[in-house]
């Protein structure tokens, strides 16, 4: 239990920067000075839910950096209503560490800003957490927004480092499509494969590939070989490798050109044109998802903030249905189910009358204390989902070559089960083969049915997917076949 709460505390801390909803300084205990040392980084946040900006001291969840640099981030209050003029798509960058995911994200916002379709974000604004500064790698999941001529995008810059695959699972679960970034100079690497596998597991339906660092590859044939290797790799994970668009370019040279001249138009710089070409392909290849707006409302909670005098804000992606101000919702999972009224809805610092499936929003909840609600719970239309601790699932256990276990496991095995934004320890009580015969042992590479008992109740339902993790790596993926308790 202690390890779970510690893990969720770390996860909560790690997502703070991605959301523009204000926590209140008074929500921490009165001995703030004792809890947060003076060298903690400081975050100034404000939103339309609160009249004055509040200050939050962010303390790094890891102790690796020997020093932390105090920095201020100011998030402006809501600037009016969010207008639904274009279809909305959730997208994200995935791929190996240092292949250029965050650089590409910055180049995308700068290029589309030059067309008047987004607010430009510099590299350090996206890559903005103490751990990232200390190790030069992206750890947190940052969300930016931009528009093409036809669509509005919410873009998640997914972490690439293997230690932070947990965030990747949460981030990838939010994607309608992905941009896989592969260095043309290095080709596919271990985390490239792990991210493609994770994308398959959590149901990312489509992806477009950006072969980065083209300027570092002298031989055109080498680039073609890397492209061929990427297509074969995608096909091996059951993506349509032969059809997926692959665009080569240099995110860094495009970003440098845009920093030097932010008003560059199409046709004026070959590297910036590659960025436009990438987004043309994303527009064409990644379909607008069919939103599940007709189904009952459900949103998995990713983060929680408290605002004195107003209530508590829960942030996350609306999985299905719609929710309006004034509607009653159930809070389900981990603790006893209770209900509350939604008193405010916000997306990207703008007020919404109604949130619908696919939106990343913050919901202000009446009469709920911050201690009553946590990451991993879900908000849902009353009576439409219930918490469970026991289910039967169809599970694929990864082979050693896929990064899975090297040895078999038996009934009584206790890994972590990742469902939506929840990670809960569970016990495998019964193992059955595909033919329905009880089995004693599961080998890496097996597809089996198993009965799982969770140590805490989680809002789950038939057809829901999950990942199985052990010792910092994914060892299996499954789908719930039947709820038992």
From Swiss-Prot:
Give GO MF terms, alphabetically. Answer: GTP binding; GTPase activity; translation elongation factor activity
Q: Which Gene3D superfamilies match?
A: P-loop containing nucleotide triphosphate hydrolases (3.40.50.300), Translation factors (2.40.30.10)
Per the record, which residues fall in region G3?
Answer: 157-160
Q: Where does GTP bind?
A: 95-102, 157-161, 212-215
Q: Which domain of life is it from?
A: Eukaryota
InterPro entries, per database record: EF-Tu_GTP-bd, EF-Tu_GTPase, EFTu-like_2, EFTU_2, G_TR_CS, P-loop_NTPase, Small_GTP-bd, T_Tr_GTP-bd_dom
Q: Name one Pfam family in it.
A: GTP_EFTU_D2
Q: What is this protein called?
A: Elongation factor TuB, chloroplastic
List locations, semicolon-separated. Plastid, Chloroplast
Region: G2; residue ranges are 136-140
Reported function: This protein promotes the GTP-dependent binding of aminoacyl-tRNA to the A-site of ribosomes during protein biosynthesis.
Q: Where is the tr-type G domain positioned along the sequence? A: 86-290
Cellular component GO terms, alphabetical:
chloroplast; mitochondrion
| Residue span of region G4 | 212-215
Report the transit peptide positions. Answer: 1-76
Q: Which organism is it from?
A: Nicotiana sylvestris (Wood tobacco)
Give the span(s) annotated as G1.
95-102
Q: Which cysteines share a disulfide bond?
A: none
Instruction: Give the CDD domains listed for this entry.
Output: EF_Tu (cd01884), EFTU_II (cd03697), EFTU_III (cd03707)
Identify its protein family: Belongs to the TRAFAC class translation factor GTPase superfamily. Classic translation factor GTPase family. EF-Tu/EF-1A subfamily.
Gene Ontology biological process terms, A to Z = mitochondrial translational elongation
User: Which controlled-vocabulary keywords does the entry list?
Assistant: Chloroplast, Elongation factor, GTP-binding, Nucleotide-binding, Plastid, Protein biosynthesis, Transit peptide
């Amino acid at each position: 239990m202690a390890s779970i709460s510690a893990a969720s505390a770390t996860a909560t801390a790690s997502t703070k920067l991605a959301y523009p909803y204000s926590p209140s300084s008074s929500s921490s205990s009165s001995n703030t000075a004792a809890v947060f040392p003076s060298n903690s980084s400081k975050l100034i946040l404000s939103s339309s839910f609160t009249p004055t900006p509040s200050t939050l001291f962010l303390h790094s969840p890891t102790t690796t950096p020997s020093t932390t640099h105090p920095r201020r981030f100011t998030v402006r209050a809501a600037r009016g209503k969010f207008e639904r003029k274009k279809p909305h798509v959730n997208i994200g960058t995935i791929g190996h560490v240092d292949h250029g995911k965050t650089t590409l994200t910055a180049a995308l916002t700068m290029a589309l800003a030059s067309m008047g379709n987004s607010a430009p974000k510099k590299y350090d604004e996206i890559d903005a957490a103490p751990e990232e500064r200390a190790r030069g790698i992206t750890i947190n999941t940052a969300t930016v927004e931009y528009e093409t001529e036809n669509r509005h995008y919410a873009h998640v810059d997914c972490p690439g480092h293997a230690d932070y695959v947990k965030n990747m699972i949460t981030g990838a679960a939010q994607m309608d499509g992905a941009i896989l970034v592969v260095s043309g100079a290095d080709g596919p690497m271990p985390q490239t494969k792990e991210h493609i596998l994770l994308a398959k597991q959590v149901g990312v339906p489509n992806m477009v590939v950006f072969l980065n660092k083209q300027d570092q590859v002298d031989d055109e044939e080498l680039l073609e070989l890397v492209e061929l290797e990427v297509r074969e790799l995608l096909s091996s994970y059951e993506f349509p490798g032969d059809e997926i668009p692959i665009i080569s370019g240099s995110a860094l040279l495009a970003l440098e050109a845009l920093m030097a001249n932010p008003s560059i138009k199409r046709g004026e710089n070959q590297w910036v044109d590659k960025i436009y070409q990438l987004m043309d392909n994303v527009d064409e290849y990644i379909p607008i998802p069919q939103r599940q707006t007709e189904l009952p409302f459900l949103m998995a909670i990713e983060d929680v903030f408290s605002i004195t005098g107003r209530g508590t804000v829960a942030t996350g992606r609306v999985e299905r249905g719609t929710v309006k101000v004034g509607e009653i919702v159930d809070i389900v999972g981990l603790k006893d189910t209770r209900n509350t009224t939604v008193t405010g809805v916000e997306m990207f610092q703008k007020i919404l009358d109604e949130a619908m499936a696919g939106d990343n929003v913050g919901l202000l909840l009446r009469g709920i204390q911050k201690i009553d609600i946590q990451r991993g719970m879900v908000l849902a239309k009353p009576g439409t989902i219930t918490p469970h601790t026991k289910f039967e699932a169809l599970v694929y256990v990864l082979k050693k070559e896929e990064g899975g276990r090297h040895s078999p496991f038996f009934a009584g095995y206790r890994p972590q089960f990742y469902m939506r934004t929840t990670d809960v320890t569970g016990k495998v009580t019964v193992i059955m083969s595909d033919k329905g015969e009880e089995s004693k042992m599961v080998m890496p590479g097996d597809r089996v049915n198993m009965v799982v008992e969770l140590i805490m109740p989680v809002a789950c339902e038939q057809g829901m997917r999950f990942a199985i993790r052990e010792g910092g790596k994914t060892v299996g993926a499954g789908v719930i076949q039947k709820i038992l308790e």
